[in-house]
From Swiss-Prot:
Function: Catalyzes the conversion of dihydroorotate to orotate with quinone as electron acceptor.
Coiled coil: none
Binding annotation for substrate: 69, 114-118, 175, 180, 249-250
Catalytic reaction(s) noted: (S)-dihydroorotate + a quinone = orotate + a quinol
Active site: residue positions: 178
Enzyme class of the recorded protein, top EC level: oxidoreductase
Binding-site residues for FMN, renumbered to this chain: 65-69, 89, 142, 175, 220, 248, 271, 300, 321-322
Cofactor note: Binds 1 FMN per subunit.
Descriptive protein name: Dihydroorotate dehydrogenase (quinone)
Record-linked Pfam families: DHO_dh (PF01180)
Family: Belongs to the dihydroorotate dehydrogenase family. Type 2 subfamily.
């Protein structure tokens, strides 16, 4: 039902400020989940099970982190047919993020630019929201560092968040690739990444012993990487036996949107313009890690064929964000069906 109404809703939402529309949609989804009205949103999406990271996904099409930073609308989002949901990024302490305006639509390019800056209510409230959700599917919890934490002490924030979210996560994503937190992408450097992942894997094992379950770790990386950086990241993932990698986050490049309104705004660009760059990173990374580190492909998916292209590049699963905002819940079903056809062809 909601899928058929979404084009009308989008026309109204796109007349609003981008961030105001975002908050309004999240509030509506959150209310639907809390009141049981989520059944009215329920989408008919076929099952297409896939096992990755030792987890069985209802289908391989997930929601990327960033849409629901505080985990406040999990049940409403779950009704839309996603095979898994990822919420966050959350930081140890609440923080407001960057000054507004900080989210911009580029409709001519079917793109968004954001410089949100990990705005969230902090990990304690995040955990309460996750615990309150009735959803029992695969749930990824995405963690980051506070803006005022020195980059040299970033590991402390990640370790703290990992400990807090671990009991409630199907998997935990380590976000080191947002361009909107100063110096964060430095953690993708070989030495910095090696030290961070070593600390996180040690913590993961101790938490697994404590809770009696091993929660997989996924690393989220940027598309703005050269071949040597991709190789170094691949080697580090293999060395530390990280369970998955999410490729990719938003790009700093503006090559595909030059001259468009808002194109010069600072922040990360997502949507169609990042599709090819994301796929290229997926291909190169897959050549390095093979099947040992599953890749979750995200970036510029607007059709079932786009989702299939991610898998052809080497991804095991895909996630939607900007395409979902532009096309609505119908995109979820379209992607699942396209992938299912590919597997039975």
């Amino acid at each position: 039902m909601f899928s058929s109404l979404y084009p009308l809703a989008r026309a109204s939402l796109f007349k609003m400020d981008a961030e105001d529309a975002h908050h309004l949609t999240l509030r509506a989804l959150g209310a639907a989940g809390r009141t049981g009205l989520a059944c009215a949103l329920s989408a008919r999406v076929p099952d297409a099970p896939r096992t990755v990271m030792g987890l069985t996904f209802r289908n391989p099409v997930g929601l990327a982190a960033g849409l629901d930073k505080d985990g406040a609308a999990i049940d409403g989002l779950a009704a839309l047919g996603f095979g898994f949901i990822e919420v966050g990024t959350v930081t140890p302490r609440a923080q407001p993020g960057n000054p507004r305006p900080r989210m911009f639509r580029l409709p001519q390019a079917e793109a968004l630019i954001n410089r949100m800056g990990f705005n969230n209510h902090g990990v304690d409230q995040f955990v309460k929201n996750v615990q309150a959700a009735r959803y029992r599917g695969i749930l990824g919890l995405n963690i980051g560092k506070n803006a005022d934490t020195p980059i040299e002490r970033a590991a402390e924030d990640y370790l703290y968040c990992l400990e807090r979210v671990y009991p409630f996560a199907s998997y935990v994503t380590i976000n080191i690739s947002s361009p909107n937190t100063k110096n964060l992408r430095q953690l993708q450097g070989a030495g910095e990444l090696d030290a961070l992942l070593a600390a996180l894997k040690d913590k993961q094992q101790r938490l697994a012993d404590l809770h009696g379950k091993l929660v997989p770790l996924a690393l989220k990386i940027a598309p703005d990487l050269d071949d040597e950086q991709v190789k170094e990241i691949g080697d580090t993932l293999l060395r530390h036996k990280i369970e998955a990698v999410i490729a990719t986050n938003t790009t700093l490049s503006r090559a595909a949107v030059q001259g468009l309104p808002h194109a010069d705004e600072a922040g990360g660009l997502s949507g169609r313009p990042v599709f090819d760059a994301s796929n290229e990173v997926i291909r190169k990374l897959h050549a390095e890690v093979g099947s040992e580190v599953p890749i979750i492909g995200v970036g510029g998916i607007f059709s079932g064929e786009d989702a299939r292209a991610k898998l052809a590049a080497g991804a095991a699963l895909v996630q939607l964000y900007t395409g979902f905002i532009y096309r609505g819940p119908a995109l979820v079903s379209e992607c699942v069906k396209a992938i299912a056809r590919e597997r039975t062809a």
